[in-house]
Amino acid sequence: MTLHDLKEKHDKLKKLDGGGFFKGATYKTFGSETHRYKFNSCLTENILQSFEKSYGSTLPADYKSFLTQIGNGGSGPAYGLLPLLDWNVELEINDNSFLSTTFPHIDKWNATQDFDIDDDDYTETKEFQKWEEDYFSNRHITGSIRICHYGCAIYYFLVVTGNNAGQIWVDDRANDNGIYPAISKSTGGQLTFLEWYDEWLTESLNEFA
C-alpha cells in the first residue's frame, strides 16, 4: 500500500460520504462528521527532526511519510487523527524521556482486581485506590503517542520505542479492558500505522458497496 493508493481510496470515500454522492448518506461513516475528511497542513522534515531530537525517539517511517505528504492529523478512523503535537492529549506528561522509554507490553495487558466489587463502597477502599492509581499510571504507555480518539475515552496509540515500535495499540483502560494491540480483521495480525489506516478506508468503503 503506497501513499498514492491510500490517497486515492481516501478521495473515493470522501466523494461517497463527505461529498454526499448518495442522497442522505453524507457523513454516514462513524466519526466522519467531526473531521469531514479534511487534513491539517503537512509537517516539514525539519519539524519532525526537531520533535524527535526533543524526545530522543524516532517516529515510524510510514507515519512520518503520512505527516509530510498527506497531513498532520485530520481525516481518519473514528473522530480523526490527532496532530503530532497533541500526542499527549489528556495525559499529564512532563518528562522528555517518556517517548524514549521502552513500551512495556508485548501482548495484551489488563490488571487483576484485588477488591470486592460487590461491596457498595469498594471505590472508597485503599485497595481500590491503590489499584486505580497503578492501573491508570502512564508507565503502562511509555514509548507511545496517542494518535486517535475512538470515543468513550478509548484511544488508539502508536508505539515508537521497543519491540512493538511501529504498531497501533488500543488504550481501553477507561472501560476496564486494559491495553491491547489493534488486530486486522482480515489477516488477524497486528497493524502498522498505514495498515491500520488502510483497513479503516476499506471497511468504510464497504459500507457503500
For the regions a language model picked out, list residue spans one by one.
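Long, compositionally biased interface segments
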Residues: N177-A209
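Extended serine/threonine-enriched, polar tracts that run as long, contiguous segments within proteins
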Residues: S137-N164
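A surface-exposed partner-binding patch
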Residues: M1-I145, F208
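Polar low-complexity intrinsically disordered regions
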Residues: M1, Y156, G162, I168, ...
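Segments surrounding the PLD/"HKD" phosphodiesterase catalytic module and close analogs
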Residues: Y155-Q190
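Surface-exposed loop/turn and secondary-structure junction residues enriched for glycine/proline
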Residues: D62, L84-W87, T161, D171, ...
